[in-house]
């Protein structure tokens, strides 16, 4: 059994009737605790094939789109800490080997001022860190990050230079135009890849504005 916990809701996925192995899509890791007190939890269960296959999982929340591509198969050994039980054990009352799906999540330090803006007409560094669900005992390492920026609402995307800045962490340097050349702010599109070949692409249509 595999488990997916995500901060957003799926917008398109394979038809459940074609899937045979249980995978849990939960609104958050807190769903297990919610189930324990008898509250209704936002949990969706799908059947996935037992054999290894490549999957795409897409979400959209408040205009931010995220697309994961990852490889999954039926686990033969559990890969979750004993202190954090599998959601399926609690919600679906199922037992057996369990592990989270190896989805890469992204954390941003945009280096903004107190007004959540950045200075126009200069090179601006941002920090992006890839991470995984806490339940994943042996996560891969994020090895590559590609960044793009748009100043016209996503019509034109410009490549942004990036460099490694620690484990799973990268610095991207965005060359800001003058403020009047980006009236709608700065959009970001980040693509990360880990050592196992899993990827995530996240598009933020208005990450921040210029001052």
Stretch-by-stretch model annotation:
Residues 1-28, 32-211:
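Low-complexity, acidic Ser/Thr/Pro-rich "mucin-like" tracts of secreted and single-pass surface proteins
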């Amino acid at each position: 059994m595999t488990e997916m916990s995500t901060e957003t809701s799926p917008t398109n996925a394979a038809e459940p009737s074609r899937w045979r192995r249980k995978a849990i899509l939960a609104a958050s890791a807190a769903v297990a605790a919610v189930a324990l007190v008898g509250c209704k939890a936002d949990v969706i269960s799908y059947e996935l094939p037992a054999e290894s296959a490549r999957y795409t999982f897409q979400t959209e929340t408040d205009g931010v789109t995220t697309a994961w591509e990852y490889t999954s198969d039926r686990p033969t050994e559990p890969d979750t800490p004993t202190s954090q039980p599998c959601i399926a054990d609690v919600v679906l009352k199922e037992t057996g080997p369990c592990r989270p799906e190896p989805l890469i999540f992204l954390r941003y330090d945009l280096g903004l001022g107190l007004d959540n803006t950045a200075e126009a007409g200069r090179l601006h560094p941002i920090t992006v860190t890839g991470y995984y669900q806490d339940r994943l005992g042996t996560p891969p390492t994020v090895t590559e990050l590609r960044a793009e920026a748009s100043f016209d609402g996503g019509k034109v995307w410009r490549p942004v230079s990036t460099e490694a800045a620690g484990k799973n962490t990268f610095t991207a340097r965005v060359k800001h135009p003058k403020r009047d050349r980006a009236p709608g702010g700065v959009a970001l599109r980040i693509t990360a890849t880990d050592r196992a070949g899993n990827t995530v692409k996240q598009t933020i249509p208005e990450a921040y504005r210029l001052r």
